[in-house]
């Protein structure tokens, strides 16, 4: 039995590993010649960590996951704590620690784990079709591949999604721009073992520790889409948007490198009613394009891969397995997309009265409510 996996990112590679572990031969195709992650880092929460370990890639997370032991929200003007608490109760309840990981390291290590030579690069898919014995897929270079079934893990701009859904869904602008990158840890900005977030005015500035003594940082600003901003104006743009913010935020703006800082207009897509058509299944961002507001995009792709691989361990009935995959994943990923959207709206001042109420809640937060919410999301995954 042979699977065609379209996409060599986190979703595609984890799917390929899961299928290989189930004894299925996979061919992996990637559109670009060199994968460059869109964001500087990825949040791998305990549900994702469990999935990586389940797939046999736990060492990658242990090597590159940052020491995120505490969580704090800070006032945007004074830089003083609104709330600060240990994440130890979350680790105890979920059986794993949260691991922010540099995206480039994660991508590279997963690629090495699978085998770089086992990925066909420069293969941009144009279409697919099913036939009695399996599936065919065509690429822009005129080549074609055949397999018994196909996993479309070709990202949020998936070319194969319309085949599965029967329509082309529109991406929805979430209403804010995100700048992100990596800087050396500076305790004058934030503790090196803490996820620190400054909030105010419907904006946020956040830092998470990753490997090699670095912070993953991001700035969020509610803005119209399509503004003429690029790296040449980046520091000035951030200085303007965060004028008057706390000294730590100003230090971060001064410390970042505009040439390695990403600027992304954040989108999501309305959750889908289906993830499968016949012998073709959507996986990862192709199947559930979400905002990053609860940090579950990468974790959801890993969950997809675990469910898919485990189902094929139990059965070789392709149609039946893919139906079960859809049944097990549709509600879960819908929940994650909509939770992220709700969190996005509160964080970014869609209704400033609600956002101000959240800021006030943070002043009385002991950690219990936030940890309960995180645990509910994490424990909804396939590995508990």
Curated annotation (Swiss-Prot):
Entry GO MF terms: FAD binding; FAD-dependent urate hydroxylase activity; oxidoreductase activity, acting on paired donors, with incorporation or reduction of molecular oxygen, NAD(P)H as one donor, and incorporation of one atom of oxygen; urate oxidase activity
Binding of substrate, residues: 178, 204, 216-218
Reactions catalysed according to its record: urate + NADH + O2 + H(+) = 5-hydroxyisourate + NAD(+) + H2O
Residues binding FAD: 11, 30-31, 43, 125, 285, 295-299
Site entry: Involved in substrate activation for the transfer of oxygen from the flavin hydroperoxide: 204
Single GO biological process annotation from the record: purine nucleobase metabolic process
Cofactor(s) recorded in Swiss-Prot or TrEMBL: FAD
Keyword Flavoprotein: yes
Domain of life, source organism: Bacteria
Protein name from the UniProt record: FAD-dependent urate hydroxylase
Biological source species: Klebsiella oxytoca
Higher taxonomy: Bacteria, Pseudomonadati, Pseudomonadota, Gammaproteobacteria, Enterobacterales
């Amino acid at each position: 039995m042979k699977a065609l996996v379209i996409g060599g990112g986190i979703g595609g590679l984890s799917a390929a590993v899961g299928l290989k572990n189930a004894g299925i031969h996979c061919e992996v195709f990637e559109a670009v010649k060199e994968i460059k992650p869109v964001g500087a880092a990825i949040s791998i929460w305990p549900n994702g960590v469990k999935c990586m370990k389940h797939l046999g890639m736990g060492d990658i997370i242990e090597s590159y996951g940052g020491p995120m032991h505490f969580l704090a929200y800070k006032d945007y003007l004074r830089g003083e704590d609104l709330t600060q608490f240990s994440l130890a109760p979350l680790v105890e309840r979920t059986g794993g620690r949260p691991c922010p990981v540099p995206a480039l390291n994660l991508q590279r290590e997963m690629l090495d784990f699978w085998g770089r030579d086992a990925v066909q690069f420069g293969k941009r898919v144009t279409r697919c079709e099913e036939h009695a014995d399996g599936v065919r897929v065509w690429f822009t270079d005129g080549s074609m591949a055949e397999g018994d079934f196909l996993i479309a893990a070709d990202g949020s701009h998936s070319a194969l999604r319309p085949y599965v859904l029967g329509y082309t869904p529109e991406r929805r602008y979430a209403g804010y721009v995100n700048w992100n990158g990596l800087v050396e840890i500076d305790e004058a900005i934030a503790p090196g073992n803490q996820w620190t977030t400054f909030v105010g005015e419907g904006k946020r500035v956040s830092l998470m520790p990753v490997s090699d003594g670095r912070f993953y940082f991001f700035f969020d600003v509610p803005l119209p889409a399509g503004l003429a901003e690029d790296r040449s104006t980046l520091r000035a743009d951030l200085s303007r948007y965060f004028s008057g913010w706390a000294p730590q935020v100003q230090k971060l703006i001064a410390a970042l490198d505009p040439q390695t800082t990403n600027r992304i207009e954040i989108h999501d897509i309305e959750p889908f009613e289906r993830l499968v058509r016949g012998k073709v299944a959507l996986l990862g961002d192709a199947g559930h394009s979400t905002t990053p507001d609860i940090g579950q995009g990468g974790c959801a792709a890993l969950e997809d891969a675990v469910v898919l691989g485990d189902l094929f361990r139990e059965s070789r009935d392709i149609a039946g397995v893919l139906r079960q995959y859809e049944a097990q994943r549709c509600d879960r990923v819908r929940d994650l997309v909509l939770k992220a959207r709700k969190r996005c709206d509160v964080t970014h001042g869609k209704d400033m009265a609600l956002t101000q109420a959240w800021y006030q809640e943070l002043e009385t937060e002991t950690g219990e409510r936030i940890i309960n919410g995180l645990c509910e999301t994490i424990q909804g995954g396939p590995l508990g």
